[in-house]
Amino acid sequence: MADLSKYRNIGIFAHVDAGKTTTTERILKLTGKIHRLGEVHDGASTMDFMDQEAERGITIQSAATTCFWKDHRFNVIDTPGHVDFTVEVYRSLKVLDGGIGVFCGSGGVEPQSETNWRYANESEVSRLIFVNKLDRMGADFFRVVEQVKKVLGANPLVMTLPIGREDEFVGVVDVLTRQAFVWDDSGLPENYEIKEIPADMVDQVEEYREMMIESAVEQDDELMMAYMEGEEPSIEQIKACIRKGTRDLAFFPTYCGSAFKNKGMQLVLDAVVDYLPSPTEVEPQPLTNPETGEPTGEVATVSVDAPLKALAFKIMDDRFGALTFIRIYSGRLKKGDTVLNSATGKTERIGRMVEMHANDRNELEAAQAGDIIAVVGMKNVQTGHTLCDPKHECTLEPMIFPEPVISIAVKPKDKNGSEKMGIAIGKMVAEDPSFQVETDEDSGETILKGMGELHLDIKVDILKRTYGVELEVGAPQVAYRETITKAVEDSYTHKKQSGGSGQFGKIDYRIKPGEPNSGFTFKSTVVGGNVPKEFWPAVEKGFEGMMQNGVLAGFPTLDVEVELFDGGFHAVDSSAIAFEIAAKGAFRQSMPKAGPQLLEPIMKVDVFTPEDHVGDVIGDLNRRRGMIKNQEMGATGVRVKADVPLSEMFGYIGTLRTMTSGRGQFSMEFSHYSACPSNVAEQVIAEVKERNAKK
């Protein structure tokens, strides 16, 4: 049985182009998992195994790989850096115990780095920092360290210092051991020598070593007192303090190097062993009540002897069949075991289990707490489902995914492609919870919903290449919403007599704007039995059912509070269905009186531009109804942060590249809903009516 203290479940995350996938490749090379190094530049990278990833040079799915370093087992997950795929980062962070944040030595803290860092903070994941690409023109390790402090509000603990700059970067100094690691120009990671620290760096190394020890001993009162009295702790004592501080997120051990040139990577791997936590050292996953989603107060203790508790965190369909990636928190799992899916109440037999290496695999007979593995051919499991021992039912804390903000209508070019498309989309929805599909009841069109243009582009591409479904794609549509601005007190009676028993339900109610992000809330203050209590849920159901189709343009309605305060019933003719119909009629009657208003999604946009184009970029964002929030001067350009309506951002990447001669970058994520200006609202409503008229 494997020793859990020697497990490290880690993720590698960063901004697009910070060198994340290359860093992972180097880890695999150094740990003996691959023999020829794949480069993202030439589309041969091991972790980027989808066609779309190899072509675009970005990582879309989180590939999981197992490798070994100094008798420790690493389960490594390479996460995407593009903002449209942050759901993959979020999903990975859910099952990781530690991570490596990769930053570009010249680009520094870029927009997506911030988003991923925030997610990792929320998940309380311990991290190392690796400042990569120090061989690049304009790379500056110390500037990036300052940016980490200023932009991320984090505390980087410098563990290595660079020897040389840009194309003269030859190696690193280990601040703790006072050793210089110098590589030759062969590009081979093993071709290095350990030397004396260069004379011109001795003072700098001592300065950083003192700062490092001061930060470390703050984790141990006795050591701190001894250090203040002039007694230097041993290297092992310092390491123990750094390990504790890293685990508690007090600081982030920070390394430097060049993954592409194979310089500095061994020290990062040693740091994973020395400072990142094992599965037994992180807060155990909370168990929740499946009905309410509230924590029960119990946890999934990380132990091989406890009953099985595992989380399905990713579904993937590949050339070998359907794969369900699971993180085992407690217990053991063997081939042939029967497990309970607590979300469906159904049991499944475990057939084949595999350990993944990007998209290759090793067959397993058994797995245990701490393992991240894939199970082949599970039937009814979705992302976020808990798999457990049938005799010890439990539910792990579920995953919550962001709502899609953009949609496109699609239909197969070939009339016979509908069934094929339906099967393919079904598989893709199971794989990616932020990708949703629905059918327009009036037009029969299939509507695909996602997190951004690139997200949906790639889905259409996968349908074409992987499943052979050619699509006609409509223009992107924005996920507008509706709300109300005024309170209304009203009454509605539903009455139907047609021989025999009829239908009767009378409700007196108030509708008013709810708190932001409250969705729909309902309460009854009826006294005296004018509307019997058993009919209150029917009234609530009637109102809530109508919230999906607002009165302005049929968009879902947000933040509405309904109070039922009186009404009337008939001893024979009243029923739950009569009161539900009354509530639906009341919605149609009163919502137009309540000042209905169209809401549009506002995106948090983060643009990086060379300084000489900043005026053009800001002018363009203003024309897009953007509100500029912040401007920051960096070493290589300017970062502009703005809130911009999603409807104004379609095709923005092309405009930005043209304005900045191809040097601009941007990321955006959903921020909030805001009232549409009246001229925009009128145009949107008119377009919806025109579209509906054609159906």
Curated annotation (Swiss-Prot):
Q: Name one Pfam family in it.
A: GTP_EFTU_D2
Q: Which InterPro entries match?
A: EFG_II, EFG_III, EFG_III/V, EFG_IV, EFG_V, EFG_V-like, EFTu-like_2, G_TR_CS
Which amino acid positions bind GTP, per UniProt? Answer: 14-21, 78-82, 132-135
Assign the protein's first listed, main location to one coarse class.
Answer: cytoplasm
Domain of life assignment: Bacteria
What keywords are annotated for this sequence in UniProt? Cytoplasm, Elongation factor, GTP-binding, Nucleotide-binding, Protein biosynthesis
GO terms for MF: GTP binding; GTPase activity; guanosine tetraphosphate binding; translation elongation factor activity
Q: Where in the cell is it found?
A: Cytoplasm
Protein family according to the UniProt entry: Belongs to the TRAFAC class translation factor GTPase superfamily. Classic translation factor GTPase family. EF-G/EF-2 subfamily.
- Protein known as: Elongation factor G 2
